[in-house]
Amino acid sequence: MLEINGKEFTPDEDLVIQGDEFSACDIEQPAVIRNPFPYYDLMRQKPIQYGVRGYPPGTVQGVDEPIPAWGVFRYDEVKHVYANHKIFSSQDRMQEASEAPSMMLVNHDQPEHTFLRNVARQAFSPKRVDQDVAPWLAEICDHMLETEGPGNVDFMTNLAADLPARFIAKLLGTPADEYRKIRQFADAYMGTSTQTTEEKLATSIEFNEYFTYHVNERYKQIDAGTAEDNLMTGFIVAEDDDGKKLTPEEVKKFCITMVAGGAESSVFLLGNQIVSFLEMPELYQKMREDRSLIRPFLEENIRRTGPIQRLFRECLEDTMIGEQEIKEGEWVCVFNGSGNHDPSMFENPSEFIMDRPNVGKNLTFGHGIHHCIAALVARNEAAAMMNGILDRYKAVEPGDGEVIFQDRNFINYGPATVPVNFVPA
């Protein structure tokens, strides 16, 4: 038995290192990935430690060699790293050295990042989200829920995994019937796939080739005047104040960022949300009667069980994080999920508090210039699914089977399976 912040906690049996001996070197274990929050409580009480060895997006476990990093767990220190982007670089030399293609927008610094982000911001403006994105999502959710029907279902496999992939295929203008490829690409790229090492590497290469083909075809369609008005087309035709446009390689980079980040994290956001329904059935009934509660419910879920758990940064000069000196060239790993559970920022952080006054200060989608550009879309995906379920079913009950959380990669927190029983209204 271990005591953390006055609370008793029994570590999972398969945890290799337990109790006070637990350190940053031990964090990337399946038992911790499944439920990291008690271990975050422990790590926030310790000095910043060296030795986190994880896999950034796009790297392949068993092929690439992790670079040890300083683990940053306290809210103020996580935010400090994000805010000081000139010191803590997003350029990912581990991913760049990987045999898998290096294409993530989050792995780029100024000034390239600013130009790329400004192009993307046009696509995700609140006006466009309201006019185009929200109706698309409602339509997709209606179709999926109508097809699935009431009764027992694995929410993750049948609904959560498909919604973001279907939406991204529509957003980018790739063939609608290939949305399952989008999901497969995202799983492999973000490290949560059940594929073998060789299969993950092959899928990452196929991922790159898939969008190389579709981007090249879109350029041809634009030249011929036959291209549809969608996000990929917008990436190609957008230009900055000096008339500069994205290269085909940068357009591909955007598409892969959308798939790898949007498809994977949104899946776990949806899954964590449905788990909250199962944990708090009384809130489900309240939201059926008052849909204005959806947003605060969603925001507290994003803080308390937000999917994105950690990201890496490289230090560009000697600096300090708190009382710890970080040398130029060393890596740091910021744990968003730990910051969201820091009691110095969020009172009683493990509790679900619907009207939490500072919930908007959560770090799930990052902070500063690297705040996720698609966060508004992710929120709309979650809201669309919630509204669709609330419209059709008077209750969401535990289904046949066990809720099992994924334990393959620390990038995202969330369930692999959630059996539910949809009770028709």
Model-identified regions with their sequence ranges:
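Cytochrome P450
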Residues: 1-425
